[in-house]
Amino acid sequence: AEVWLESAAGAAVSLDGRPYEGRLRVIQQADGLLVVNHLPLEAYVASVVGAEMPSSWDREALKAQAVAARSYALAHMARPASRHWHLGDTTRWQAYRGLSSLSARTRQAARATDGLILSYQGGIVESLYAANSQISWEAHGQLGASMSQQGAQALAARGLRYGQILARYYPGASLARLRQGKA
């Protein structure tokens, strides 16, 4: 059995005191309840940026994080983690905290890079990243390219733009824009 929770127009849906954008799908399973947040991709990206990086960081680092988060999410939408959801909300995937990690700066980073992803040879890059270069290497070294979030901040502080930052961490990848289809 399942239930969908929706709020009144423009309001948030809350669960355990945490507000979420979009709708919540509550699914009864043998071991308890599974709650899945369904929301627009760009709202998800803005929340991930704020959960993964301090919103006070340089705007270019936040934009690089937005592109990496969007690319990672889309790579996983192509091969979902389960039949009920694409990504978890922990750092195993990408940290996601609903509306609690949003700020004007994280929304602006998502908006400024709206629809931009990392692409390599026509595919979407599973843009791995971690807090710093040591963690990035330990967690993803054998997999290839991975962004250090602290490194991205340092590069942004030196004046590099988000595209230049991403090029440092994902060699050979290029920025591509998603086609927005009309339904």
Task: Indicate residue ranges for each PLM-predicted region.
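Conserved, single-site charged/polar hotspot
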Residues: 1-183
